[in-house]
Amino acid sequence: MAELEIFDNGVSIEQIIPALDRDGAVIIRDLLSMEITTQIIEDLSETLEASTPGSKSGIESWEEFHGGKTVRFCGLAAKSRAFVDHALLNEYLIKVSDHYLLKSCADYWLNTGQVMAVGSSEPAQYLHRDEDN
């Protein structure tokens, strides 16, 4: 597996694209400020506390992969204005999406904004595409 390249916030999109092409992902340090991160966590904490850990699929292989102590939930845009303003509408996300998607379409939208709160002692997941998308 490739070691992901780490960039500082403020780097140009032109510097990021070659690493994305090569590795499929990058890390951008301090993409969201601590203040914004805290706000998103506060916005989502009630849903996190109310969510049951583990897979709801009933399929043993998915249950093992998802982890019995990990909580997942979607619909972040409806639960956190800070998520919309600072993550969903983040300049890097938009520029990267435009770079790759607008070559073959007139418009696009994000299908899922999801929290995955990995429980203690859960095994790490490898970098992967969901459902091979």
Give the ranges of each region predicted by the language model:
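Non-heme Fe(II)-dependent double-stranded beta-helix
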Residues: 1-22, 29-132
